[in-house]
Amino acid sequence: MGFPKEGETIQIHSYKHNGQIHRIWNETTILKATELCIIGANDRTMVTESDGRTWVTREPAICYFHAKQWFNVIGMLREDGIYYYCNISSPFALDDEAIKYIDYDLDVKVFPDMTYHILDEDEYADHKKAMNYPKEIDGILRYHLNTLLHWIHQRKGPFASEFIDIWYERYLHYTK
């Protein structure tokens, strides 16, 4: 499959380690797509949970997926600043249907002042045991959690001061 073109829409599918679907974002506009990274945007898109419940996102968001990093980043544009929600996950895979990744439970919420909280450590411990995460996966995830925290401190990649604003402006070009 070729990479989606800028301006095209695609779904995002997250799975759990056991292969079960976790969550589907119905529509994301592609802003950049290369072998190394995909940047997309959405606003008020429908999200379907694994149990069939649905909800709609509240604000514009820029989504950043990397082929070599075991995390993805969602920058949410709110009235009081940019908030980030970071999923510790497998690198992305892409097919005709969607951008896909495995969600490994650990999350980092980053506030506009770049302080952060690591979330769902209990859920990670439970799923690590229940789904029998291999030791190698645990090591990879811990390493990439530390890499993510380094990116936050360094304001690297999607955490760079103008990154979200620049890509949001590009997104607005496609919504006119």
Curated annotation (Swiss-Prot):
Its EC number(s): 3.6.1.15, 3.6.1.6
Reactions performed catalytically: a ribonucleoside 5'-triphosphate + H2O = a ribonucleoside 5'-diphosphate + phosphate + H(+); a ribonucleoside 5'-diphosphate + H2O = a ribonucleoside 5'-phosphate + phosphate + H(+)
Record InterPro entries: DUF402, FomD-like_sf, Ntdp-like, SA1684
Magnesium keyword on record: yes
Annotated Mg(2+) 2 binding sites: 105, 107, 120, 123
Membrane-crossing segments per the record: none
Binding sites annotated in the UniProt record for Mg(2+) 1: 87, 103, 107
Active site: 23
Gene3D superfamilies, A to Z: FomD-like
Cofactor: Mg(2+)
GO molecular function, one term: magnesium ion binding
Record's keyword terms, sorted: Hydrolase, Magnesium, Metal-binding
Function: Has nucleoside phosphatase activity towards nucleoside triphosphates and nucleoside diphosphates.
Sequence similarity: Belongs to the Ntdp family.
Protein name, per record: Nucleoside triphosphate/diphosphate phosphatase
Organism: Bacillus licheniformis (strain ATCC 14580 / DSM 13 / JCM 2505 / CCUG 7422 / NBRC 12200 / NCIMB 9375 / NCTC 10341 / NRRL NRS-1264 / Gibson 46)
